[in-house]
């Protein structure tokens, strides 16, 4: 018997190559040569029906009934068998073969399927019964042999469609070349059929088959004992063996013929499959007696029980750590040795743990291969697997089965990832997971297939796109410039199909930095490390959804838009963009979330570090203390502070970055004041406050006996929540000015100060407030300040901070010609840094100058007005719990 070449070349359909004898429809052209006329394969017969149960050796003889007669019961092929020309008598069919068609699937429904799923479905729909006549076994033995050895053992004659001619000496090479061609044209399941049927040929002049082949096959037949044992074992409902028993004996022991219906995992035996199915069914036969946990295997339960018994038999010989499992100990030892035995084949990275390698592979190698395969569904994956099956001459069936199971598993994973949209991007931003539904397969597929390496090399770590908010989405597409625009548009739509792994999946950690100047977004930083630090610190900062002018977009997803917007610093001079700083996020946090108790220390410290390089060369010009109040112009559109009323045009103006800082803080102060429902601290008459760029690195703790001098009064603010990190800030970024009229000035001279943590300040503040709770008017005595001074002396040796009095002039320029009648209210800082102040309670704060040059501060308030953070003015000289002793007795009124 012989299978016609139409099955090979046509792939179960019409003849692909045409010509005489090349397709299933050309049997009459080649059938006039004698009694050995070939029975040709029915063109509509489904390719994947060449499957065998383990009770029967494989059969490769599928014949067409003669004339218009009904199919004989020995070969019932349902509707797929049609009448052949009457002039073509078929060879005698296998009398022992009966195909039972299950009603679940129709054989005619599968011919066009080209995926491995069709392979499985058609496999489910066919059952074969055991042969009744043992006399037919030798011929089947020979056919069976050709399934495995026909390619390489001696294929006699190839049909003209195979291009083989009459000579059998070219058979192996011709078959291999043919299979290479078909590997590029047909899906994976064809390779199995091609390989199975390619060698089973009889010569043109008869049906006699070489006896040595039959002898070889008999030598390869399994022992009847093993066959009987396996025949007794009932296959699981989930088990659909891919091979027969006879084939299984020939194949290598590493084969996994048992496939799980749930996840397409392959197993060597039905026991392993049944044990695996428990994972899907949720059954846990082994229950722990001490907790509610259950396990599918006994050894897992025994290992778990060691947790309850606290038994850790495996200890590290280099440290004191012990482990329940030996594997955990060995894995731990690699942390001492630095060994990284696990290598990613795609990017050549090494890993010390398999779980890290697997996590990396999800974003690296297999994802890229999967993307390339899905770009060209018919050729890429199956082509590689087909060539693999052909070239592995040692165990072709094993390689075929492995490749099939891999293709099933990979395809299943593709479906899952397509549904859940879960993919991650590694730090080096590898391209990943091109969609199954990629539009314009021919163009985009070729681009993806050929240029992935180049694409990876060209992909930048960060893309900065200038433009308005509506263009923010398009900036993400710059990651995939080699791809056509259709890909980008589809991925922007957020569909699970047309997704680039970078664009349309939830957990992408791309950070797109978009800074807006006057409402427009532009680049703010090219420093990737700063961006990552900011993304770590954003856990402190809830999302500020509405910020008018400045935003830093930390995008997790285009569709998700997990954006942290913050009042960024406007870069007025476009020479060098500012690095990404946390002050912008801090401003947005203060502005949008007034109910937060304070700002994290890390955020404040990063602000201080950002503006630590200010000039100290500018001169002092005090403001008059007794002048009436003039509001500061804080329009968001101004690029500088308005100077016509409160700035001196004759003095040196601050640099652009300082001006932009002043502008931002002034704008924030004004907005906070307008939104404030809590009356904060109103400074006394003539007290002027200049907008803070950022809180001081520490409390401005003034050294003893030098607090009051005749220099202009400059008092830098120290915030109650200050950074615990050491800072080398040479001076306070902003200060507070007092007028020159009383002749009493406060000067911050150079001193060494130890920074105090916010918790220490808060504790001291609460303690002092509790002590003062019984009296509405209280006085912070000099005795307390003395004790605080002693503490300060002990702390003076740690960190040095210089607080020059020239700082003020670097922030604002007072007028020399006319004395501005300006005061600044600081209610907004009460709102910004401590929204816990009760609404409606105004805490007036005034500085009263005594005749002897002392400043008397009193605060008439109760502790109920405070909720944990002192007012900003308490840091002008010292807070209620200040750690500096001043030579005068001061209290707050």
UniProtKB/Swiss-Prot annotation:
Stretches with biased composition (Basic and acidic residues): 127-139, 201-216, 616-641
Cross-referenced InterPro entries: C2H2-ZF_domain, Znf_C2H2_sf, Znf_C2H2_type
Organism of this sequence: Mus musculus
Pfam family, any one: zf-C2H2
Gene Ontology molecular function: any one: RNA polymerase II cis-regulatory region sequence-specific DNA binding
Function: Transcription repressor that plays a role in regulation of embryonic stem cells (ESCs) differentiation. Required for ESCs differentiation and acts by mediating autorepression of NANOG in ESCs: binds to the NANOG promoter and promotes association of NANOG protein to its own promoter and recruits the NuRD complex, which deacetylates histones. Not required for establishement and maintenance of ESCs. Represses the transcription of a number of genes including GAST, ODC1 and VIM. Binds to the G-rich box in the enhancer region of these genes.
Assembly: Interacts with NANOG. Associates with the NuRD complex.
Sequence ranges of Gly residues compositional bias: 7-36, 161-170
Cross-link annotation Glycyl lysine isopeptide (Lys-Gly) (interchain with G-Cter in SUMO2), location: 2, 100, 127, 211, 217, 223, 230, 240, 256, 298, 322, 370, 406, 413, 457, 474, 490, 495, 536, 596, 614, 619, 658, 667, 784, 789, 793, 816, 838
Record keywords: Differentiation, DNA-binding, Isopeptide bond, Metal-binding, Nucleus, Phosphoprotein, Repeat, Repressor, Transcription, Transcription regulation, Ubl conjugation, Zinc, Zinc-finger
Modified residues (Phosphothreonine): 886
SUPFAM superfamilies for this protein: beta-beta-alpha zinc fingers
Start and end residues, zinc fingers (C2H2-type): 258-280, 286-308, 314-336, 342-364
Family of the protein in this entry: Belongs to the krueppel C2H2-type zinc-finger protein family.
Protein known as: Zinc finger protein 281
PANTHER family: C2H2-TYPE DOMAIN-CONTAINING PROTEIN-RELATED, FINGER PUTATIVE TRANSCRIPTION FACTOR FAMILY-RELATED
Phenotype when the gene is knocked out: Embryos die between embryonic day 7.5 (E7.5) and E8.5, due to dysregulation of pluripotency and lineage specific markers in embryonic stem cells (ESCs). Embryos show abnormal embryonic body differentiation.
């Amino acid at each position: 018997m012989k299978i016609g070449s139409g099955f090979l070349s046509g792939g179960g359909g019409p003849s692909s190559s045409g010509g005489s004898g090349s397709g299933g429809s050309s049997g009459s052209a080649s059938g006039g040569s004698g009694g050995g006329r070939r029975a040709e394969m029915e063109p509509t017969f489904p390719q994947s029906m060449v499957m065998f149960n383990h009770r029967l050796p494989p059969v490769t003889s599928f014949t067409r009934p003669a004339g218009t007669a009904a199919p004989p019961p020995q070969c019932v092929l349902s509707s797929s068998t049609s009448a052949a020309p009457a002039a073509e008598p078929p060879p005698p069919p296998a009398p022992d073969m009966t195909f039972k068609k299950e009603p679940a699937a129709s054989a005619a429904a599968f011919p066009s399927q080209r995926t491995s799923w069709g392979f499985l479905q058609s496999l489910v729909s066919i059952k074969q019964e055991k042969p009744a006549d043992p006399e037919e076994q030798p011929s089947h033995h020979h056919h069976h042999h050709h399934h495995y050895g026909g390619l390489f053992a001696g294929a006699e004659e190839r049909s003209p469609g195979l291009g083989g001619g009459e000579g059998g000496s070219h058979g192996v090479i011709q078959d291999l070349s043919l299979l290479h061609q078909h590997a590029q044209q047909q899906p994976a399941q064809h390779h199995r059929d091609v390989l199975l049927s390619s060698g089973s040929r009889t010569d043109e002049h008869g049906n006699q088959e070489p006896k040595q082949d039959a002898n070889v096959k008999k030598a390869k037949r399994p022992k009847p004992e093993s066959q009987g044992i396996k025949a007794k074992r009932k296959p699981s409902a989930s088990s659909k063996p891919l091979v027969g028993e006879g084939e299984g004996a020939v194949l290598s022991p590493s084969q996994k013929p048992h496939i799980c219906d749930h996840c397409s995992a392959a197993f060597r035996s039905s026991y392993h499959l049944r044990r695996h199915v428990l994972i899907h069914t949720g059954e846990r036969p082994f229950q722990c007696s001490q907790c509610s946990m259950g396990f599918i295997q006994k050894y897992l339960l025994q290992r778990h029980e060691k947790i309850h018994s606290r038994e850790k038999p495996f200890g590290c010989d280099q440290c004191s750590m012990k482990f329940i499992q030996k594997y955990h100990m060995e894995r731990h030892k690699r942390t001492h040795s630095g060994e990284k035995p696990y290598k990613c084949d795609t990017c050549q990275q090494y890993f010390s743990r398999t779980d890290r390698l697997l996590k990396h592979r999800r974003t690296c190698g297999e994802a890229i291969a999967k993307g390339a395969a899905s770009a060209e569904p018919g050729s890429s994956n199956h082509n590689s697997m087909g060539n693999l099956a052909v070239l592995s001459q040692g165990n072709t069936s094993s390689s075929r089965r492995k490749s099939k199971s891999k293709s099933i598993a990979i395809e299943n994973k593709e479906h899952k990832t397509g549904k859940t949209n879960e993919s991650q991007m590694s730090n080096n931003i590898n391209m990943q997971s091109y969609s199954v539904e990629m539009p314009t397969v021919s163009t985009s597929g070729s681009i993806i297939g050929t240029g992935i390496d180049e694409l990876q090399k060209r992909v930048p770590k960060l893309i900065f796109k200038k433009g308005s908010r509506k263009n923010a989405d398009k900036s993400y597409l710059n990651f995939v410039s080699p791809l056509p625009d259709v890909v980008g548009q589809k991925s922007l739509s957020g569909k699970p199909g047309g997704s680039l792994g970078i664009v349309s999946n939830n957990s992408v950690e791309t950070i797109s930095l978009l800074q807006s100047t006057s409402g427009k977004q532009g680049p703010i930083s090219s420093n990737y490390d700063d961006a990552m630090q900011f993304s770590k610190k954003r856990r402190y900062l809830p999302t500020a959804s509405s910020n008018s002018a400045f935003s830093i977009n930390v995008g997790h997803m285009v569709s998700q838009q997990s954006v942290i917007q913050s009042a960024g610093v406007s870069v007025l001079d476009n020479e060098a963009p500012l690095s990404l700083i946390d002050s912008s996020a801090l401003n947005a946090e203060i502005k949008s979330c007034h109910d937060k108790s304070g700002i994290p220390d890390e955020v404040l410290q990063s602000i201080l570090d950002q503006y630590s390089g200010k000039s100290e060369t500018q001169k002092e010009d005090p403001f008059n203390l007794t002048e009436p109040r003039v509001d500061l112009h804080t329009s968001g559109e101004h690029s500088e502070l308005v100077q016509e009323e409160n700035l001196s045009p004759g003095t040196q103006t601050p640099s652009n970055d300082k001006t932009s800082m002043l502008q931002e803080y002034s704008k924030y102060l004004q907005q906070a004041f307008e939104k404030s429902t809590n009356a904060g601290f109103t400074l006394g008459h003539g007290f002027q406050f200049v907008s803070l760029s950022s809180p001081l690195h520490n409390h401005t703790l003034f050294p003893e006996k030098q607090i009051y001098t005749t220099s202009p009064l400059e008092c830098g603010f120290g915030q109650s929540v200050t950074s615990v990190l050491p800072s080398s800030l040479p001076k306070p970024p902003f200060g507070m000015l007092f007028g020159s009229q009383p002749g009493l000035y406060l000067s911050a001279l150079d001193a060494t100060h130890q920074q105090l943590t916010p918790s220490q300040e808060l504790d001291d503040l609460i303690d002092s407030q509790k002590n003062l709770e019984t009296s509405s008017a209280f006085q912070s005595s000099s005795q307390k300040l003395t004790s605080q001074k002693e503490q300060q002396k002990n702390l003076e040796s740690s960190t040095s901070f210089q607080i020059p009095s020239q700082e003020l002039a670097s922030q604002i320029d007072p007028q020399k010609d006319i004395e501005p009648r300006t005061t600044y209210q600081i209610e907004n800082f009460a709102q910004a840094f401590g929204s816990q102040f009760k609404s409606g309670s105004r805490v007036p704060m005034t500085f009263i100058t005594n005749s002897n040059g002392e400043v008397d501060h009193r605060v008439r308030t109760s502790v109920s007005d405070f909720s944990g953070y002192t007012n900003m003015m308490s840091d002008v000289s010292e807070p209620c719990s200040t750690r500096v002793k001043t030579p005068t007795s001061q209290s707050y009124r």
